Amino acid sequence: MISGILASPGITFGKALLLKNEILSINYKKISNQDIHQEVKKFINGKNKTICQLQEIKNKTQQKFENTQSNIFEGHIMLLEDDEFQQKIISLIQDRNISSEYATKIIIEEHAKTLEQLNDEYLKNRAIDIQDIGNRLLKNILNIDIKDLNNIKNPVILIARDLTPSETAQINLKKVLGFITDLGGQTSHTSIIARSLELPAIVGTKNITEKAKNDDFIILDSINNKISINPSLEEIHRIKQKKKKYESEKKLLIESKNLYAITKDKHKVEIGANISTIQDINNAKKYGAECIGLYRTEFLFMNRNYLPSEEEQFNTYKTIAEEMKNKSIIIRTMDVGGDKNISYMNIPKEENPFLGWRAIRIAIDRKEILHAQLKAILRASAFGKLRIMFPMIISVEEVRTLQYELEKLKQLLHHQKIPFNAKIEVGIMIETPASAIIAHHLAQEVDFFSIGSNDLTQYTLAVDRGNDLISHLYNPMSPSVLSLIQQVINASHKVGKWTGMCGELAGDEKATLLLLGMGLDEFSMSAATIPKIKKIIRESTFLDVKKLAKKVLLQPTYNEVNNTINTFININNKNK
């Protein structure tokens, strides 16, 4: 049995189609001074041909998906049109007398290596995009035909080392049953595509392409993280029954998506969605989100060569406000820097980016960026229920500085007679032990907290979850992390404020009852998880889960925490 990283839930079975990536062998090639002009011309022609192809792929993608996917190719085109990128390659050809393809290979590998070394999973996965652009550009420089993947005739499970944006844009996705890849994580392109199409996917299997062959019969169970190659007839019969049951349960969950998350003894919590783009709102609505618990604005700042203007940001926030029709939207100010290095912002390279110049630290130092974003949010607040949230807070001083800047901008808009919500709520992310420990002070300064469980876990346990040697130590349900979460919730409630959570823990089925019992007021998660979490809450009793939380918080180890929760769930299931 093969497993990997669960990227998109579902169960499917069918024949394998193995996509083997062609590896281009580009060797060092010295050229004479007389050939330099011709090699530069060869590069420019190849670059222009690549841009035309990407524009065509972008147009096709807009028909298949929404702008969120076609925007990937906009970023690819922008890189190819970037003067600095072009000049680096041309300079190598001219200064070192090397062929256009070898110069291109060097620069592409430099770009990809820079991304691969980052700690941020999303940006690390963009290295595949760079390699995809490079592969296409090199083929065009060398006049090698690029194969057409649009001719899939029968339903298949696609198996690949990794799927690039340009490959998925060309594939006949109507014939795809699911995806399995050697590489990738939750934020890789394959995962994003699979979730948007609601197709089962398991990524990061390490070696599926070595184990499966074309036309092998594959069972892909991305609920239980199991892949089976050429199973027995008995296994096929079992998976058919399992798939039928899963589809039936999924249908019932979707039908009940708009029911509120209210326990049997009438305790209500709010369930929201985390989004990164305007297009994500469609999924949020589809799965019954009552609010947007986290809008990650940093994606507005990425895949471009300049800062988004106040006007561009205003139009984006206004659209989201109008789309959500008076439902709450928490807009987190840009969380970039350190590992999310945006070239045009000139963020210095740091030894330890997770402890470096990032998020609100950049905003306080670069007030023109902060002011443009806050003004855009304030202006958009006239069109819906927007809330502002600041990330990476460690002190009361930071909060007061940010509140002061916000008040100045409110006065400016008031003098300019520009409408905005003067009472817009302001909250902070609790994602550092520092902010959790002084939550009782911070609760006096803001309207709400939202716990970023991913970073809070990482900082509390001093564990880089991207480091394979120690990733097993990363555990958001360790007693130390749970203790801090409870401390934060209690601090907010003591002064009549509320606490939400927008990290992965908020959408973890096993953690739901515990967090509910701890008093969490709002859960924000990936949209597809919402119906299941709502159902778990509706089937629970607040009085019982409060007792569970009290018991769990007394446990000294994760195993004892886990056993306590499992025992509670098993007893509850028997009593249903």
Curated annotation (Swiss-Prot):
The catalysed reaction is:
L-histidyl-[protein] + phosphoenolpyruvate = N(pros)-phospho-L-histidyl-[protein] + pyruvate
Q: Any idea which UniProt keywords this protein has?
A: Cytoplasm, Kinase, Magnesium, Metal-binding, Phosphotransferase system, Sugar transport, Transferase, Transport
Where's it found, cell-wise? Cytoplasm
Is this entry keyworded Plastid? no
Official protein name in the record: Phosphoenolpyruvate-protein phosphotransferase
Q: Which InterPro entries match?
A: PEP-util_enz_mobile_dom, PEP-utilizing_PTS_enzyme, PEP_util_AS, PEP_util_C, PEP_util_CS, Phosphohistidine_dom_sf, PTS_EI, PTS_EI-like
GO biological process terms held by the UniProt record: phosphoenolpyruvate-dependent sugar phosphotransferase system
Instruction: Give the active-site positions.
Output: H189, C502
**Subunit comment for this entry?**
Homodimer.
- Annotated phosphoenolpyruvate binding lies at R296, R332, N454, D455, R465
Question: Where primarily located?
Answer: cytoplasm
**One annotated GO molecular function:** phosphoenolpyruvate-protein phosphotransferase activity
Q: Which GO terms describe its cellular component?
A: cytoplasm
**One Pfam family per UniProt:** PEP-utilisers_N
> Lineage of the native species?
Bacteria, Pseudomonadati, Pseudomonadota, Gammaproteobacteria, Enterobacterales
- Record's miscellaneous remark: The reaction takes place in three steps, mediated by a phosphocarrier histidine residue located on the surface of the central domain. The two first partial reactions are catalyzed at an active site located on the N-terminal domain, and the third partial reaction is catalyzed at an active site located on the C-terminal domain. For catalytic turnover, the central domain swivels from the concave surface of the N-terminal domain to that of the C-terminal domain.
Enzyme class (EC, first level): transferase
